[in-house]
Amino acid sequence: MTKSELIERIVTHQGLLSSKDVELAIKTMLEQMSQCLATGDRIEIRGFGSFSLHYRAPRVGRNPKTGRSVSLDGKFVPHFKPGKELRDRVNEDEEEGF
């Protein structure tokens, strides 16, 4: 699902909200989450999951075009850990044949 598809779904289910209002709310939420992660903060949404940063150590990689070894610096990458309710719901749907 893309961001625009999510906006459409919310607008369809919530008749009182305009497409522009939903778009602004989602943009604001994503921007705030990005800013929190950029400063090293952890985001926890109970029942859904948590977002945090994991450190990837420096390593030697390979350029796929040339096959030559390339030194890659260490970096932080966003990580999502699903909450129990989300895991249970996904597995519940899987058991029903979805």
From Swiss-Prot:
NCBIfam families in alphabetical order: hip, PRK00199.1
Quaternary structure, from the entry: Heterodimer of an alpha and a beta chain.
GO molecular function: DNA binding; structural constituent of chromatin
One Pfam match: Bac_DNA_binding
Gene3D superfamilies to which the protein is assigned, alphabetical: IHF-like DNA-binding proteins (4.10.520.10)
Taxonomic classification: Bacteria, Pseudomonadati, Pseudomonadota, Gammaproteobacteria, Pseudomonadales
Stored SMART domains: BHL
Keywords: DNA recombination, DNA-binding, Transcription, Transcription regulation, Translation regulation
Family: Belongs to the bacterial histone-like protein family.
GO biological process, one term: regulation of DNA-templated transcription
Record's protein name: Integration host factor subunit beta
Protein task: This protein is one of the two subunits of integration host factor, a specific DNA-binding protein that functions in genetic recombination as well as in transcriptional and translational control.
Keyword DNA-binding: yes
Any single Gene Ontology cellular-component annotation: chromosome
Organism, scientific name: Pseudomonas savastanoi pv. phaseolicola (strain 1448A / Race 6) (Pseudomonas syringae pv. phaseolicola (strain 1448A / Race 6))
Cross-referenced PANTHER family: DNA-BINDING PROTEIN HU (PTHR33175), INTEGRATION HOST FACTOR SUBUNIT BETA (PTHR33175:SF5)
